[in-house]
Amino acid sequence: MSALTWAVAAVVTDPSGRVLLCRQSGGGRRWALPGGRLRRDESPPAAARREIRAETGWEVELVDLVGLYRLGDPAAPPPRAGHCGALPDVLVHVFRARVLGDAPAGTAAGGCHLDWHPPDALPEALTPTTRTAVADALAGRSGVLREPAHHLPPGQRAAGEVGTTRP
């Protein structure tokens, strides 16, 4: 079993309801939510604000926690040094957030192309977790717990959620 990696991400919206997505310059070049790993002794909300500010330049208000999303395969062996391998076991805290202000407060880190997308016109090249988390956030869900399909008991759907919808 691999060590669990704790991460954060946020479905960041602007006043018109568009969603901020980041397209990494390497890898499969899919769009994802802004976010990153927690630092030692850092709370998930503090990490989310820090990562979003560093990656996008925007200051945000965290509205609430959409849910926890588990990625990867904890049973997968670690990759050999210098080689790609299975995604490590990652637990992502996904928040719902709003931008503060009319423009970024700082400079975005390199390596990420940022763009705003209307919720009804999201790009096709989204990571599966991003697609699911955005749908959950825009539907007003909170307290969602999601795992990849290969971690679920037989007969349980991968798209099923535990949680509530905000009034």
What are these regions (language model features)?
Residues M1-V19, R37:
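Conserved N-terminal beta-strand and adjoining loop/helix that marks the start
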Residues L38-E61, L71-A135, G163-P167:
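Unchanged
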Residues A32-G35:
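A short gly/proline-enriched turn/hairpin at secondary-structure junctions
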Residues L4, R29, D89-L91:
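Residue-level preference for beta-strand/loop junctions
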Residues A135-P167:
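Charged phosphate-binding loop/patch that engages nucleotide di/tri-phosphates or the phosphate backbone
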Residues V63-G67:
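Conserved S-adenosyl-L-methionine
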